[in-house]
């Protein structure tokens, strides 16, 4: 009965420890997943804000050129310099009446860029367009249209995914190392307890034998004295 109760207590403790470990790991993984989602949203917003900021700065630069009646070559040169950005595919300048004033040297037809003239389904997810008004003191001078590659943001997300996959792997390794360490400590403690118990039992047996020998010796002396 005592052994059954002891086994039940041990099984209950082991089950509680396992449930607690699973709960802790679940909470950690949930927190990591939430942090991953937040990082992805932050990276998307960062890329979007950066692209809008660069386009707005370029529009301010083109505003000065349009006010000074710059030539088409100057506008094209400015657009080519802007198109060297990693995410920019092409850019065009339109007047406030919608007339095309200049475009990049590697300008592609808008319909061709978006795949509207292609018999296949256009890949709208890979390209996006931003139209930024070009302001001056006189009002709207024109519009800047920029086609940029949305894969730039996806590349950032893929890097974040890769980093978090590494983090998941490290968490699993840490968990397994903790299990191994706990098992090793449990083994050595159990071995130490068994060894200590044997030594204690041997000492008790020796003391008992010594007492028995002393008792026998005194009994013999009493018999001899009689």
From Swiss-Prot:
The gene is ahpA. Keywords: Cell inner membrane, Cell membrane, Membrane, Transmembrane, Transmembrane helix. The keyword Nucleotide-binding does not apply. It comes from Pasteurella multocida (strain Pm70). It holds the Pfam family SMP_2. Belongs to the Smp family. Signal peptide: none annotated. This is Protein AhpA. It is found in: Cell inner membrane.
